[in-house]
């Protein structure tokens, strides 16, 4: 007999209460269970000692706590850490931890590949395979938090020092094109019985899916970042193809609406600096006009070159001059420090070692090698003896 176990990482707080109700348990059991999973990193029901044995026995036959398997783990010379994560069928995504003084930021993925296909992003050149499940999204945070604690010898649980203080959905994929799993994962990040992160410390980055920006403002408004990268529609149409469907004026209006519900009083506009493409003083002046009615700040991102792009990075003097025009116009502007270049973890390089859809057979062979070395993937249908 083949039975599909329920992966409890897929359930938000309300869903976990409902699931426990189906097992004949009261709501407080769901909160206990949630704390064991998300605060203590437990994956063994027998370790959950304050749960009744009868409940633990039920869970062992009906449920699992299964994050995606880690294929590889690399640490950069600057402390940035990147995990390559197996999401099945020859697909992998990447999760990146960026340590800074008094904070630790985790960059997570929401899709295997990306359909938006921005010209300057290597992930989009790999094609789109599928959306990630809730468990595959929140599982990145679950895995990273407790792996970082284990590395440092920090105990699990709320008394242990939290390693991840900020989460950014800026990895592989467009979060708003995988809406329901993304929002469920966000709710878990914010819940006090799970990770308890402030809405101000969780940022969702989008290329500009206007209707879903409006929906997010009602369902789970977190800090918003927008991948802008151009100062006019003609330029953005070529860099971010989604702009043809949701042009800049519609996007700016959506950003203004979002701020009525957002935890921060500004939108962050991300702008990849491309030599001779979008980096002139005139482009900067156009930006000042474009965003004049949107409270915002700019984050200028030095481009990370890859062979298929045909693009090059703006030099440092040009980036600084561009930033100065924006600052002279009254905009808070930062220049992102590149991190993790030596392990291909920098922004735009999250293409994965096995995610090239143009070489399916090679990819599947490579994944089979990883499976043989690191063990069978988690999160699959499990055979239970009848």
Swiss-Prot record:
Disulfide bond residue pairs: 107-347
Function: Specifically methylates position 2 of adenine 2503 in 23S rRNA and position 2 of adenine 37 in tRNAs. m2A2503 modification seems to play a crucial role in the proofreading step occurring at the peptidyl transferase center and thus would serve to optimize ribosomal fidelity.
UniProt family annotation: Belongs to the radical SAM superfamily. RlmN family.
CDD domains listed in its UniProt record: Radical_SAM
Cofactor-binding details, from the entry: Binds 1 [4Fe-4S] cluster. The cluster is coordinated with 3 cysteines and an exchangeable S-adenosyl-L-methionine.
Pfam families: Radical_SAM, RlmN_N
Note: Reaction proceeds by a ping-pong mechanism involving intermediate methylation of a conserved cysteine residue.
Primary location class: cytoplasm
BP-aspect Gene Ontology terms: rRNA base methylation; tRNA methylation
Binding site for S-adenosyl-L-methionine: 173-174, 205, 227-229, 304
Positions annotated as active site in the UniProt record: 94 (proton acceptor), 347 (s-methylcysteine intermediate)
Cofactor(s) needed by this chain: [4Fe-4S] cluster
Name this protein carries in UniProt: Dual-specificity RNA methyltransferase RlmN
Residues noted as binding [4Fe-4S] cluster in the record, renumbered to the chain: 114, 118, 121
Organism (species): Herminiimonas arsenicoxydans
GO cellular component: cytoplasm
Enzyme class: transferase
Keywords: 4Fe-4S, Cytoplasm, Disulfide bond, Iron, Iron-sulfur, Metal-binding, Methyltransferase, rRNA processing, S-adenosyl-L-methionine, Transferase, tRNA processing
Every Radical SAM core domain range: 100-341
EC number: 2.1.1.192
UniProt catalytic activity: adenosine(2503) in 23S rRNA + 2 reduced [2Fe-2S]-[ferredoxin] + 2 S-adenosyl-L-methionine = 2-methyladenosine(2503) in 23S rRNA + 5'-deoxyadenosine + L-methionine + 2 oxidized [2Fe-2S]-[ferredoxin] + S-adenosyl-L-homocysteine; adenosine(37) in tRNA + 2 reduced [2Fe-2S]-[ferredoxin] + 2 S-adenosyl-L-methionine = 2-methyladenosine(37) in tRNA + 5'-deoxyadenosine + L-methionine + 2 oxidized [2Fe-2S]-[ferredoxin] + S-adenosyl-L-homocysteine
Molecular functions per Gene Ontology: 4 iron, 4 sulfur cluster binding; metal ion binding; rRNA (adenine(2503)-C2-)-methyltransferase activity; rRNA binding; tRNA (adenine(37)-C2)-methyltransferase activity; tRNA binding
Location of the protein in the cell: Cytoplasm
KW Metal-binding (keyword) present: yes
């Amino acid at each position: 007999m083949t039975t599909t176990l329920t992966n409890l990482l897929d359930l938000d707080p309300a869903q976990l209460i409902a699931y426990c109700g189906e097992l004949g348990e009261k709501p407080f059991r769901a909160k206990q269970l949630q704390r064991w999973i998300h605060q203590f990193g437990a994956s063994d029901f027998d370790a959950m000692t304050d749960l009744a044995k009868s409940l633990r026995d039920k869970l062992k036959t009906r449920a699992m706590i299964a994050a995606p398997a880690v294929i590889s783990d690399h640490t950069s010379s600057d402390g940035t850490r990147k995990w390559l994560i197996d999401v099945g069928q020859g697909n992998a995504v990447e999760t990146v931890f960026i340590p800074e003084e008094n904070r630790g930021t985790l960059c997570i993925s929401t899709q295997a590949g990306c359909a938006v296909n921005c010209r300057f992003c290597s992930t989009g050149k790999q094609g789109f395979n599928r959306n990630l499940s809730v468990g595959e999204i929140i599982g990145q945070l679950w895995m990273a938090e407790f792996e970082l604690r284990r590395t440092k010898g920090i105990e699990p649980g709320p008394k242990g020092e939290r390693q991840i203080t900020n989460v950014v959905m800026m990895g592989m994929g467009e979060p708003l094109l995988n809406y329901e799993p993304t929002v469920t994962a966000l709710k878990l990040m914010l819940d006090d019985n799970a990770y308890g992160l402030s809405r101000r410390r969780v940022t969702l980055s989008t290329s500009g899916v206007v209707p879903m920006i409006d929906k997010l403002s009602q369902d789970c408004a977190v800090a918003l970042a927008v991948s802008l990268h151009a100062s006019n529609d003609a330029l953005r149409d070529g860099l971010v193809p989604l702009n043809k469907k949701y042009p800049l004026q519609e996007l700016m209006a959506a950003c203004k609406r979002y701020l009525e519900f957002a935890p921060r009083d500004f939108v962050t506009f991300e702008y990849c600096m491309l030599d001779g493409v979008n980096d002139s003083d005139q482009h900067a002046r156009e930006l000042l006009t474009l965003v004049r009615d949107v409270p915002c700040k700019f984050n200028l991102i030095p481009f990370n070159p890859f062979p298929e792009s045909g693009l090059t990075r703006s030099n440092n003097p040009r980036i600084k001059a561009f930033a100065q025009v924006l600052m002279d116009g009254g905009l808070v502007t930062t220049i992102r420090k590149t991190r993790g270049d030596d392990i291909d973890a920098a922004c735009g390089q999250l293409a994965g070692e096995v995610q090239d859809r143009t070489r399916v057979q090679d990819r599947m062979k490579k994944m089979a090698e990883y499976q043989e070395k690191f063990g069978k993937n988690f999160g699959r249908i499990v055979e239970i003896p009848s």
